[in-house]
Amino acid sequence: MINRFLIALSFLTVLPLKFKEINEKELIRSIIFFPFIGFLEGVFCIFLVNIFKQIFSSSVISIILLVFLFSVRGIFHIDGLSDTFDALFYKGTGQKEKDLQQRLQIMKDSVIGVAGAVALVLDVLCRFAFVKELIDINQFLIFLFMFCFSRWIVIPLMYYGKPARTTGLGVLFIGKISSWQVIISTVLPIFLLVYFTIEKNFIFLPLIALFLFFISYILKKFFERKFNGITGDHLGATVEITEIVFLICFLLGEKLWLSY
Protein backbone atom coordinates (compact mmCIF):
# COMPACT_ATOMS: atom_id res chain seq x y z
CA MET A 1 0.00 0.00 0.00
CA ILE A 2 2.83 2.41 0.87
CA ASN A 3 4.51 1.47 -2.39
CA ARG A 4 1.38 2.46 -4.32
CA PHE A 5 1.21 5.76 -2.48
CA LEU A 6 4.83 6.49 -3.43
CA ILE A 7 4.09 5.55 -7.04
CA ALA A 8 1.16 7.98 -7.10
CA LEU A 9 3.28 10.69 -5.48
CA SER A 10 6.05 10.17 -8.00
CA PHE A 11 3.62 10.09 -10.94
CA LEU A 12 1.83 13.32 -10.01
CA THR A 13 4.88 15.25 -8.83
CA VAL A 14 8.52 15.75 -9.75
CA LEU A 15 9.77 14.24 -6.48
CA PRO A 16 12.54 11.66 -7.15
CA LEU A 17 11.22 8.71 -5.15
CA LYS A 18 12.29 5.09 -5.08
CA PHE A 19 9.93 2.12 -4.82
CA LYS A 20 10.16 -1.58 -4.21
CA GLU A 21 8.27 -2.36 -7.39
CA ILE A 22 6.67 -0.44 -10.22
CA ASN A 23 4.72 -1.92 -13.10
CA GLU A 24 1.57 -1.15 -15.03
CA LYS A 25 -0.63 -3.05 -12.58
CA GLU A 26 0.75 -1.19 -9.55
CA LEU A 27 0.54 2.13 -11.39
CA ILE A 28 -3.16 1.60 -12.14
CA ARG A 29 -3.86 0.63 -8.53
CA SER A 30 -2.06 3.74 -7.28
CA ILE A 31 -4.84 6.02 -8.56
CA ILE A 32 -6.78 5.58 -5.29
CA PHE A 33 -4.15 7.88 -3.75
CA PHE A 34 -4.60 10.69 -6.30
CA PRO A 35 -7.08 12.64 -4.11
CA PHE A 36 -4.79 12.24 -1.10
CA ILE A 37 -1.89 13.70 -3.10
CA GLY A 38 -4.10 16.70 -3.84
CA PHE A 39 -4.99 16.93 -0.15
CA LEU A 40 -1.27 17.07 0.71
CA GLU A 41 -0.78 19.86 -1.83
CA GLY A 42 -3.50 21.75 0.01
CA VAL A 43 -1.83 21.12 3.36
CA PHE A 44 1.48 22.55 2.16
CA CYS A 45 -0.21 25.55 0.53
CA ILE A 46 -2.00 26.35 3.80
CA PHE A 47 1.28 25.92 5.66
CA LEU A 48 2.98 28.42 3.34
CA VAL A 49 0.16 30.94 3.71
CA ASN A 50 0.34 30.74 7.51
CA ILE A 51 4.11 31.22 7.44
CA PHE A 52 4.14 34.24 5.13
CA LYS A 53 0.86 36.05 5.83
CA GLN A 54 2.46 38.14 8.59
CA ILE A 55 5.38 39.04 6.35
CA PHE A 56 4.16 39.54 2.79
CA SER A 57 1.08 40.85 1.04
CA SER A 58 -1.50 38.46 -0.38
CA SER A 59 -0.15 39.17 -3.88
CA VAL A 60 3.33 37.97 -2.94
CA ILE A 61 1.93 34.93 -1.14
CA SER A 62 -0.15 34.06 -4.20
CA ILE A 63 3.01 34.10 -6.32
CA ILE A 64 4.81 31.95 -3.74
CA LEU A 65 2.02 29.37 -3.94
CA LEU A 66 2.13 29.34 -7.73
CA VAL A 67 5.89 28.81 -7.67
CA PHE A 68 5.47 26.04 -5.10
CA LEU A 69 2.82 24.23 -7.16
CA PHE A 70 4.90 24.53 -10.32
CA SER A 71 7.97 23.25 -8.46
CA VAL A 72 6.06 20.23 -7.14
CA ARG A 73 3.90 19.43 -10.15
CA GLY A 74 6.31 20.41 -12.88
CA ILE A 75 4.68 20.87 -16.29
CA PHE A 76 2.56 17.73 -15.98
CA HIS A 77 -0.86 19.44 -16.05
CA ILE A 78 -0.15 22.78 -17.71
CA ASP A 79 1.50 20.99 -20.62
CA GLY A 80 -1.72 19.04 -21.08
CA LEU A 81 -3.70 22.27 -20.97
CA SER A 82 -1.58 23.99 -23.61
CA ASP A 83 -1.46 20.94 -25.89
CA THR A 84 -5.22 20.50 -25.64
CA PHE A 85 -5.95 24.12 -26.55
CA ASP A 86 -3.47 24.07 -29.44
CA ALA A 87 -5.24 21.01 -30.83
CA LEU A 88 -8.73 22.42 -30.27
CA PHE A 89 -7.91 25.62 -32.15
CA TYR A 90 -6.73 23.71 -35.22
CA LYS A 91 -9.11 24.96 -37.93
CA GLY A 92 -9.38 21.65 -39.76
CA THR A 93 -9.96 20.67 -43.37
CA GLY A 94 -13.50 19.38 -43.05
CA GLN A 95 -12.33 15.77 -43.36
CA LYS A 96 -13.21 14.19 -40.03
CA GLU A 97 -10.59 11.43 -39.91
CA LYS A 98 -7.78 13.61 -41.21
CA ASP A 99 -8.62 16.40 -38.74
CA LEU A 100 -8.78 13.89 -35.89
CA GLN A 101 -5.30 12.57 -36.63
CA GLN A 102 -3.95 16.10 -37.03
CA ARG A 103 -5.31 17.16 -33.63
CA LEU A 104 -3.70 14.14 -32.00
CA GLN A 105 -0.44 14.93 -33.77
CA ILE A 106 -0.54 18.56 -32.60
CA MET A 107 -0.79 17.39 -28.99
CA LYS A 108 2.36 15.32 -29.46
CA ASP A 109 4.26 18.29 -30.89
CA SER A 110 6.69 19.76 -28.34
CA VAL A 111 6.33 23.26 -29.84
CA ILE A 112 3.68 25.38 -28.12
CA GLY A 113 1.25 27.29 -30.32
CA VAL A 114 -0.54 30.60 -29.84
CA ALA A 115 -3.68 29.01 -28.39
CA GLY A 116 -1.65 26.98 -25.93
CA ALA A 117 0.35 30.03 -24.87
CA VAL A 118 -2.81 32.07 -24.33
CA ALA A 119 -4.32 29.23 -22.27
CA LEU A 120 -1.22 29.11 -20.06
CA VAL A 121 -1.17 32.87 -19.51
CA LEU A 122 -4.87 32.93 -18.63
CA ASP A 123 -4.40 29.96 -16.31
CA VAL A 124 -1.59 31.67 -14.39
CA LEU A 125 -3.38 35.03 -14.24
CA CYS A 126 -6.62 33.47 -13.00
CA ARG A 127 -4.81 31.44 -10.37
CA PHE A 128 -2.90 34.45 -9.15
CA ALA A 129 -5.99 36.66 -8.89
CA PHE A 130 -8.32 34.08 -7.36
CA VAL A 131 -5.79 32.67 -4.89
CA LYS A 132 -4.98 36.23 -3.80
CA GLU A 133 -8.69 36.83 -3.23
CA LEU A 134 -8.99 33.64 -1.16
CA ILE A 135 -6.13 34.78 1.04
CA ASP A 136 -7.64 38.26 1.38
CA ILE A 137 -10.94 36.85 2.70
CA ASN A 138 -9.09 34.32 4.87
CA GLN A 139 -10.71 31.26 3.28
CA PHE A 140 -7.57 29.48 2.12
CA LEU A 141 -8.44 26.32 4.10
CA ILE A 142 -10.60 25.40 1.13
CA PHE A 143 -7.36 24.49 -0.67
CA LEU A 144 -7.70 21.11 1.05
CA PHE A 145 -10.90 20.32 -0.80
CA MET A 146 -10.02 22.06 -4.06
CA PHE A 147 -6.81 20.17 -4.74
CA CYS A 148 -8.25 16.89 -3.47
CA PHE A 149 -11.31 17.24 -5.71
CA SER A 150 -9.34 18.28 -8.79
CA ARG A 151 -7.20 15.15 -8.47
CA TRP A 152 -10.29 13.01 -7.97
CA ILE A 153 -12.30 14.43 -10.88
CA VAL A 154 -10.11 12.68 -13.47
CA ILE A 155 -10.79 9.24 -11.96
CA PRO A 156 -14.40 9.05 -13.25
CA LEU A 157 -13.05 10.21 -16.63
CA MET A 158 -10.60 7.31 -16.58
CA TYR A 159 -13.36 4.89 -15.60
CA TYR A 160 -16.00 5.94 -18.14
CA GLY A 161 -13.74 7.22 -20.90
CA LYS A 162 -12.02 5.50 -23.79
CA PRO A 163 -8.43 6.15 -24.90
CA ALA A 164 -7.91 8.25 -28.02
CA ARG A 165 -4.52 6.67 -28.67
CA THR A 166 -2.92 3.26 -28.35
CA THR A 167 0.20 4.81 -26.80
CA GLY A 168 0.92 7.41 -24.13
CA LEU A 169 0.39 7.78 -20.39
CA GLY A 170 -3.37 8.03 -20.72
CA VAL A 171 -3.58 4.50 -22.11
CA LEU A 172 -2.28 3.16 -18.79
CA PHE A 173 -5.39 4.38 -16.95
CA ILE A 174 -8.26 5.25 -19.28
CA GLY A 175 -10.80 2.46 -19.42
CA LYS A 176 -8.70 0.22 -17.17
CA ILE A 177 -9.60 1.16 -13.60
CA SER A 178 -12.21 -0.73 -11.60
CA SER A 179 -15.38 0.46 -9.88
CA TRP A 180 -13.92 -0.26 -6.44
CA GLN A 181 -11.03 2.08 -7.19
CA VAL A 182 -13.53 4.82 -8.03
CA ILE A 183 -15.42 4.14 -4.78
CA ILE A 184 -12.32 4.10 -2.56
CA SER A 185 -10.91 7.24 -4.15
CA THR A 186 -14.20 9.04 -3.47
CA VAL A 187 -14.04 8.60 0.33
CA LEU A 188 -11.67 11.50 1.08
CA PRO A 189 -13.37 14.05 -1.22
CA ILE A 190 -16.77 13.17 0.29
CA PHE A 191 -15.41 13.49 3.82
CA LEU A 192 -13.93 16.92 3.07
CA LEU A 193 -17.12 17.99 1.32
CA VAL A 194 -19.22 17.09 4.37
CA TYR A 195 -16.71 18.70 6.74
CA PHE A 196 -16.56 22.05 4.95
CA THR A 197 -20.30 22.09 4.33
CA ILE A 198 -21.25 21.44 7.96
CA GLU A 199 -18.33 22.66 10.07
CA LYS A 200 -17.34 25.67 7.95
CA ASN A 201 -20.90 26.45 6.84
CA PHE A 202 -20.05 26.40 3.13
CA ILE A 203 -23.57 25.27 2.27
CA PHE A 204 -23.02 26.07 -1.42
CA LEU A 205 -20.05 23.67 -1.69
CA PRO A 206 -22.10 20.58 -2.69
CA LEU A 207 -23.60 22.59 -5.55
CA ILE A 208 -20.12 23.56 -6.72
CA ALA A 209 -19.02 19.91 -6.57
CA LEU A 210 -22.04 18.83 -8.63
CA PHE A 211 -21.41 21.61 -11.13
CA LEU A 212 -17.76 20.59 -11.51
CA PHE A 213 -18.78 16.97 -11.99
CA PHE A 214 -21.16 18.14 -14.71
CA ILE A 215 -18.34 20.17 -16.30
CA SER A 216 -16.11 17.07 -16.33
CA TYR A 217 -18.90 15.13 -18.07
CA ILE A 218 -19.22 17.87 -20.70
CA LEU A 219 -15.44 17.85 -21.19
CA LYS A 220 -15.47 14.06 -21.60
CA LYS A 221 -18.14 14.24 -24.31
CA PHE A 222 -16.36 17.15 -25.98
CA PHE A 223 -12.98 15.40 -26.02
CA GLU A 224 -14.52 12.21 -27.38
CA ARG A 225 -16.21 14.18 -30.16
CA LYS A 226 -13.08 16.12 -31.12
CA PHE A 227 -10.44 13.43 -30.51
CA ASN A 228 -12.47 10.21 -30.55
CA GLY A 229 -11.40 9.55 -26.97
CA ILE A 230 -9.39 10.90 -24.06
CA THR A 231 -5.63 11.31 -23.70
CA GLY A 232 -3.33 12.04 -20.79
CA ASP A 233 -3.19 15.66 -21.97
CA HIS A 234 -6.96 15.90 -21.57
CA LEU A 235 -6.73 14.61 -18.02
CA GLY A 236 -4.12 17.24 -17.18
CA ALA A 237 -6.23 19.95 -18.80
CA THR A 238 -9.24 18.79 -16.80
CA VAL A 239 -7.32 19.22 -13.53
CA GLU A 240 -6.34 22.77 -14.48
CA ILE A 241 -9.82 23.72 -15.67
CA THR A 242 -11.45 22.19 -12.58
CA GLU A 243 -9.29 24.23 -10.22
CA ILE A 244 -9.92 27.50 -12.05
CA VAL A 245 -13.68 26.94 -12.24
CA PHE A 246 -13.73 25.91 -8.58
CA LEU A 247 -11.99 29.12 -7.52
CA ILE A 248 -14.45 31.22 -9.52
CA CYS A 249 -17.50 29.38 -8.16
CA PHE A 250 -16.28 29.36 -4.57
CA LEU A 251 -15.47 33.07 -4.51
CA LEU A 252 -18.79 33.86 -6.17
CA GLY A 253 -20.65 31.64 -3.71
CA GLU A 254 -18.86 33.22 -0.76
CA LYS A 255 -19.67 36.74 -1.94
CA LEU A 256 -23.34 35.90 -2.53
CA TRP A 257 -23.62 34.08 0.80
CA LEU A 258 -22.12 37.00 2.73
CA SER A 259 -24.35 39.51 0.95
CA TYR A 260 -27.41 37.37 1.72
From Swiss-Prot:
It is found in: Cell inner membrane. Its EC number is 2.7.8.26. Its main location: membrane. It comes from the Bacteria. It catalyses: alpha-ribazole + adenosylcob(III)inamide-GDP = adenosylcob(III)alamin + GMP + H(+); alpha-ribazole 5'-phosphate + adenosylcob(III)inamide-GDP = adenosylcob(III)alamin 5'-phosphate + GMP + H(+). It is an enzyme of class 2 (transferase). Keywords: Cell inner membrane, Cell membrane, Cobalamin biosynthesis, Magnesium, Membrane, Transferase, Transmembrane, Transmembrane helix. One of its GO terms (cellular component) is plasma membrane. GO terms for molecular function: adenosylcobinamide-GDP ribazoletransferase activity; cobalamin 5'-phosphate synthase activity. It is a multi-pass membrane protein. Pathway: Cofactor biosynthesis; adenosylcobalamin biosynthesis; adenosylcobalamin from cob(II)yrinate a,c-diamide: step 7/7. Pfam families: CobS. GO terms for biological process: cobalamin biosynthetic process. Joins adenosylcobinamide-GDP and alpha-ribazole to generate adenosylcobalamin (Ado-cobalamin). Also synthesizes adenosylcobalamin 5'-phosphate from adenosylcobinamide-GDP and alpha-ribazole 5'-phosphate. This is Adenosylcobinamide-GDP ribazoletransferase. It comes from Thermodesulfovibrio yellowstonii (strain ATCC 51303 / DSM 11347 / YP87). The gene is cobS.
